[in-house]
Amino acid sequence: MKLSLSQPCSFSGALLLLAVSNLLVWEKVTSLPNYRLPTESLYQRVIVVSHNAHDLASKAFMEFEMKFGRTAWTYGLMLSPCHTAAILTPENSEQVHQTTSEDLLKVSITILQAWEEPLKHMVAAVAALPHVPDTLLSRTKELEERIQGLLEGLKIIFNRVYPGAVASDYTFWSAWSDLQSSDESTKNSALRTLWRCVRRDTHKVDNYLKVLKCRDVHNNNC
C-alpha cells in the first residue's frame, strides 16, 4: 500500500528524510571549491570539517591508548606540555564570548598552522609502529587532510571578512627527534602527547567556530 503525501510520516521516516536532506545540502556545499563558496556556506563546511577533525583526533587518541598506552606511560608519569601551549587562547566560555571575531579566527588559524608539521611526522611515526591497526593509520592520515582543508577554509573566510589583516604564523615545534627515537617508550610517549594535544586543540577550534558561525552568520540568533 502506498502512502499518500497527506499521511503523517513515521518517526523513522522523518529521520530518514532529514538525513537525506542534510546529505543533499552537504553534497551541494562540498561540490564547489572553497574559494567559490559564499561565506555562509563556507562556514557550514568548516564547521562540519572541524567537528570531523575533532572526532578523528578523539578516536585515534583512544585507539592509541588501548594499543600503545602502556609503553607510552613507562617513559614518565608527568604529562608533557603541548607545543601549542605558548599560543594565547580564550580558555572558557566567558573569555571566548569576550574575544572579537577577528581574534577568534586568528587564533584558530594559528593553532591549525602549528599542527601542519607535527601531523606530517605523526603519519610517518604511526606507520612505523609495530602491528599498527589499519584504523589508527587511516585516521592519522585523514586527520592531516582534514586539518589542511580546515585551515584553507578559515584563511579564505579571514581574508574575505578582514581584508588586509594578517593572521599570526606559528610553526615552532621541537619534539620531532623524539618521534624518531630508537627507544620505544620515548617514541610512544611523544606520540601520546601529540594525540592528547591535537584532541585538545581541535576541540578548542571546534568551539571557537561554533561561536563565530553564531555571530557572523546568524547574528547571534542561535
Swiss-Prot record:
Main location as per UniProt: secreted
Write out the entry's keywords from A to Z: Disulfide bond, Hormone, Secreted, Signal
| Organism lineage | Eukaryota, Metazoa, Chordata, Craniata, Vertebrata
Q: Spell out the family assignment given in the record's similarity comment.
A: Belongs to the somatotropin/prolactin family.
Q: Which PANTHER family match?
A: PROLACTIN-3B1, SOMATOTROPIN,PROLACTIN
Q: What is a single molecular function from GO for this protein?
A: hormone activity
The protein here is known as Prolactin-3B1
The record's annotation in Gene3D superfamilies points to: 1.20.1250.10
Query: Which CDD domains does the entry mention?
Result: prolactin_like (cd10288)
- Disulfide feature: 82-197, 214-222
Where found?
Secreted
Pfam families (UniProt xref): Hormone_1
What GO CC annotations are associated with the protein? extracellular space
Where does the signal peptide begin and end?
A: 1-31
